[in-house]
A protein has these predicted regions:
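Peripheral, non-catalytic segments that deliver or gate enzyme domains
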Residues: 1-233
Length: 233
């Protein structure tokens, strides 16, 4: 409790000078940028002398606007009824949505999404259970694209309409692997392609799909091993 406190600083990349912005008491978080600020997760400042002994309770998501003190940061999400939950927020690539992962009470994460294009919009629950692995890859055109173990212990890739997020409305794009592999990652590669990586027989296998889940081709590797990709829309 306290050994992994995180402090966040902001640097001007042109001059390599640190700006006055300084975030304390952050934990289990990164910085996800939107506009002239960023979202991060932090706990309330502990009492003096109890920085390393206080229980970790009240993990909130905040928005920090550049050039302002941390005390002016606004709370983007809090859940006083569940003080032991962890909350991590990320912004979609087109900055249209704020994606919230909620953990601490199961083996996975619950997921909520907020439309950032409409002021005052409410959080939409995409998956309420923390008993499943859920990873929202991106939000595009009112649809969330998510890698999930819901209905597929070895994971599948689905599209979720934010206006109708119930499980029975999910559209499966890449199903659970019929050959026993685990779908470990899916990434967008340009506007109309996906790269999916399966862990099968102690080796990674990568495939290119279109956005409807049609297999385009396998990416051939020279030998067995582990593969990772860096791509975006």
């Amino acid at each position: 409790s306290g050994s992994d406190w995180t402090e966040i600083y902001v640097m001007d990349t042109a001059t390599r000078e640190l700006l006055p912005d300084h975030i304390e008491w952050a934990k289990f978080t990164g910085a996800s940028w939107l506009g002239d600020g960023f979202y991060y997760s932090a706990y309330p400042a502990p009492e003096a002398g109890k920085e390393f002994s206080n229980a970790n309770e009240g993990h909130n998501v905040y928005y920090h606007r550049l050039g302002t003190p941390q005390c002016d940061d606004t709370i983007a999400f809090e859940d006083p009824a569940n003080p032991l939950h962890f909350h991590q927020a990320g912004v979609s690539d087109d900055q249209s949505a704020l994606i919230l992962g909620i953990g601490g009470q199961g083996i996975g994460d619950a997921v909520m999404i907020k439309d950032m294009r409409r002021p005052g919009s409410k959080w939409v629950t995409i998956e309420p259970s923390q008993e499943y692995y859920n990873d929202v890859v991106d939000v595009i055109g009112g649809n969330a694209y998510m890698l999930t173990s819901v209905g597929a212990p070895r994971n599948r890739f689905v599209k979720i309409n934010l206006a109708q997020p119930a499980r029975d409305k999910w559209v499966e794009i890449i199903p659970e692997d019929a050959d026993g592999g685990v779908l470990t990652s899916v990434q967008f590669a340009g506007k109309d392609r996906l790269i999916a990586v399966f862990d099968r027989d102690a080796s990674n296998h990568a495939y290119v799909y279109d956005l409807d889940g049609k297999l385009i081709r396998e990416i051939e590797f020279p030998t067995y091993g582990t593969a990772s990709f860096s791509s975006s829309r």
